[in-house]
């Protein structure tokens, strides 16, 4: 089941790729993908290229994939290990979701962080209290790690 579904998503991604994102298998392993997200133009991540690792469980799509940033990023919902705090990757996962939809959700999270459910409370605090400093630091990290 998982193999067939992952193959279908790969085909669909090739046919109709989401804007500013791409993803595909690492080598021959269909259960391990690498994804690329271009930093949204209307965010402090603009101009950056961010890489993510995607690991599909054997019972996909009934369990969510594990998705991690491998590029460092300054964001309240993404920690230094690249873990992402996103409800659809946890309790709000549904088998109707696809990697394409997950990547688009991550893109929109880059534009609109959720400081009320932070993975990094310090960054969320800066986001809420000093937006200019948050954006300057996010731009600096983007230049340093993603360009």
UniProtKB/Swiss-Prot annotation:
Entries under PROSITE patterns matching the protein: UBC_1, UBC_2
Function: Catalyzes the covalent attachment of ubiquitin to other proteins. May also mediate selective proteolysis pathways.
Gene it is expressed from: UBC1
Organism domain of life: Eukaryota
Protein species of origin: Colletotrichum gloeosporioides (Anthracnose fungus)
Designated name of the protein: Ubiquitin-conjugating enzyme E2-16 kDa
Ranges where the UBC core domain occurs: 1-147
Reaction equations catalysed: S-ubiquitinyl-[E1 ubiquitin-activating enzyme]-L-cysteine + [E2 ubiquitin-conjugating enzyme]-L-cysteine = [E1 ubiquitin-activating enzyme]-L-cysteine + S-ubiquitinyl-[E2 ubiquitin-conjugating enzyme]-L-cysteine
Family designation: Belongs to the ubiquitin-conjugating enzyme family.
Record's note on what induces expression: By hard-surface contact. Ethylene and the host surface wax enhance this induction which is essential for appressorium formation.
Any single biological process term in GO: protein ubiquitination
Pathway in which the depicted protein is active: Protein modification; protein ubiquitination
Keywords: ATP-binding, Nucleotide-binding, Transferase, Ubl conjugation pathway
Pfam (any one): UQ_con
UniProt-listed SMART domains: UBCc
CDD domains in UniProt: UBCc_UBE2D (cd23792)
PANTHER family the record matches: UBIQUITIN-CONJUGATING ENZYME E2
Keyword Iron-sulfur: no
């Amino acid at each position: 089941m998982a193999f067939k579904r992952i193959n279908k998503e790969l085909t669909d991604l090739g046919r109709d790729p989401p804007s500013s994102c791409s993803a595909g298998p690492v080598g021959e392993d269909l259960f391990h993908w690498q994804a690329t997200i271009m930093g949204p133009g209307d965010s402090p991540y603009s101009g950056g290229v961010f890489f993510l690792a995607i690991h599909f469980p054997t019972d996909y799509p009934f369990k969510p994939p594990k998705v991690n940033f491998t590029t460092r990023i300054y964001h309240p919902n993404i920690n230094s290990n690249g873990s992402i705090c996103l409800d659809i990757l946890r309790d709000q996962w549904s088998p109707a979701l696809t990697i394409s939809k997950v990547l688009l959700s991550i893109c929109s999270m880059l534009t609109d962080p959720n400081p009320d459910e932070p993975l990094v409370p310090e960054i969320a605090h800066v986001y809420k209290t000093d937006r200019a400093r948050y954006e300057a630091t996010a731009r600096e990290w983007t230049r340093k790690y993603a360009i």
